[in-house]
Amino acid sequence: GFKDLKITNAAGECVFALNAELDGIVSGDKSFSLDGCTKFSFTRREVFFDDMIKGELAKPLDSMKDLVIVRSDGSPVFHIANVCDDMAQKITHIVRGDDHVENTYRHILLFNALGYDIPKYAHMPMIVNKQGKPYSKRDGDAFVGDFREKGFMADAFFNYLTFLGWSPGDDREKMTRDELVLAFELERVKSSPAQLDMNKLQNLNGMYLAEMPFDIFVKQAETAVAEFDWSQGVDNDYFNTVAQLLQSRTKLFSQVDGWSYFFTDSVEYNMKNLKKALKKDEVRSGMNKVVTDLGQLTCFDAESIGSVIEVAGDVFELGSGKLNQPLRVCVTGGGIGADLLETMVVLGKEKCVSRIEAALAIDLAAE
């Protein structure tokens, strides 16, 4: 217990002792008390330590004031409680954020006063936002639960956080927990702040989703879409087909509301995007031929659809792929997505034809 542990001043006088319950027992000279609190007085000298990440750190103590260690109500403050807890658990290594560097100088003095060996310290870089400020809830998600609710997988989040300020020394970005544990070395941790990049985190999460067993992916996707009206009464086989197409492109289950165009009869168009896609006369002419020829197909597969698009492009002297983006906007309402031909096959001829016709019928000049 802490019964015999005492803190002494530079003259060797006891100013504070701790019993087994960590209750403060004030003893010693009144000069160490101010308004009922107890302060730790120390000799003004340089304090230094060899940090496992930042190297040797030192601080001249001529500007440091005596340290309050016990409040007026007798309860210990963070510094003395922290040091005594480390002593009780025989802590040899302390790894924490570098916002505690200033505290470490004070703790070293307390360890010395208590006659305890100084633990080895490793101060990790802080996670910062795009402005270089410490990341906080003002920047958005700040708690692990926030990321879980957004649909981030635990292993992906663990993977990403480990890579903040650290690297394995090779080009690997996706690693299992066991691989991370085996590869991790404090010596490879950078001392500079690490910026949280949500795009990188989402991309990494997408890699994990892409490798998830399909039956698990489908089950979680079904749970995620259940809140949307368009998901009600969906055929299971059709849903599985859509999920199989989109698994490799899904980064978060919270984004599955973007799957709606597969399940609704029509789509809502962003007029700005539609105008951009159909602004050229030759493109509109090509699209008119595409929709006519698609309607005549007896086999609506990727090869047949691709041939229709290619022929229309040649007829109106459009370069390779110039009709792909306009087609995507017309049939999905968006500008990005899974493979266009595979998407159209899943949607089926009726939906593709009706959506293209609807888009071409819009008077864009009036919009």
Q: What name fits each language-model region?
A:
Residues 102, 114-120, 124-269, 332-367:
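Catalytic adenosine-cofactor/nucleotide-binding cores of aminoacyl-tRNA synthetases and other
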Residues 97, 147, 313, 317:
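Short, charged/polar micro-motifs that form catalytic or ligand-binding hotspots
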Residues 29-48, 87-96, 149-151, 155-156, ...:
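Short, charge-rich amphipathic segments
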Residues 95-96, 146, 297-298:
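A generic structural signal for short
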Residues 2-15, 27-31, 226-240, 256-367:
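Basic, alpha-helical terminal appendages of large translation-related enzymes
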Residues 1-123, 128-135, 143, 168:
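Active-site cores that bind ATP or allylic diphosphates and position pyrophosphate for catalysis
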